[in-house]
Amino acid sequence: IGAYTDPTWSQQHSVTFSGGNNRGSFFTSLNYVHNNGVVAGDKDVYNRLSAQINADYKLFDWLTVGNNMSIEKWSTKSVSQRGYGSSFDSMLVLDPLTPVYWTTIDEMAPVMRAEYDKVQAGTAGAPYRFFGDENGFFANTQYNPESEGSPFAKRDQNESTNGGFTMRGTMFMNLTPFKGFTFTSRLGYRISQSSSHSYSSPYYINGRANSTNYSISAGANTGYYYQWENFANYNVTIAKKHNISAMAGMSYIENNSDNVSGNASGADILQAYEPNFLYLSYLKGDAADNVSNSPGKSASLAYFGRLIYSYDNRYSIQANFRADAFDSSKLSAENRWGYFPSVSAGWTSSNEKFIKDNV
């Protein structure tokens, strides 16, 4: 365990600026995070660069605008951590007498040495990789060589990377043209893109953990989401005791996504096997591949309102109404709208004089 894991180191650097005056304010920050995972080597890494911008400004006494936005770019490299056959599983069950390395081929377990000799002679079933580094080959247990293999070999059998970009935020506008009235328009949004790539070549760890095939997969996902809301509030007091509050508005939500993925595997699938060719674009014409695409779109629309009347802060009545419609591609046209009215009444007994005088 001590050889397979490293102390986790994390770096975080931030720069922030802020300012303002009697008409507005702003805040901006830039942040970088680099995190090495617990697995030794460079196969377990997380990087993120992000920025935040918040600002609001009163253009006129009756108009305020603002924006809150964040942007981030991230990338990861990871190893299998859960389940039977993962590198962590091998780390936990491998006997403690097995060294990390075989420094010479003569130290190899017999079954692995036999496959190694076949590769050297050109008679193996595939051009197997035998994992190791400048210190030697990663060792398997000699006591049961067909059981769990070296966790270091399982760590290195696959090259997997992920990355993406996300921008999200809210823009808003508040109008107050006369006393008691406020109109708000607000747009929330999220734009995202992510991609993944994985590659493995024929390898031999032991009789159970091996593959004669090259395998490659890649995927990309793009999406955008937005919610546009408009609503007005009006509050007025008449003759000091009659309070009326009204609100009406609408909300529209749209969500779009597009996912593309592809994979291929076989004994000889690529035009070449140098690092620059380890992508689906360089598949041979007769290579068996699988490509899928699953775009999606949904939308919803809502109208809502509320009316409240109260007398002397003691008696009140409230009426609410909301109508929601969902995308006709998800619901039939006759069932796409839902209507939700409600009415309530209230009595604030603590504001009654006869209770105040006796409690």
PLM segments and residue spans:
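Predominantly transmembrane beta-strands of Gram-negative outer membrane beta-barrel pores used
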Residues: 4-5, 12-40, 50-58, 66, ...
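Residues on the lipid-exposed face of transmembrane beta-strands in outer-membrane beta-barrel proteins
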Residues: 15-21, 53-57, 169-175, 230-234, ...
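Phosphate/anion-contacting hairpin/loop surfaces
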Residues: 339
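Outer-membrane beta-barrel channels and translocator barrels
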Residues: 10, 21-22, 58-60, 176-178, ...
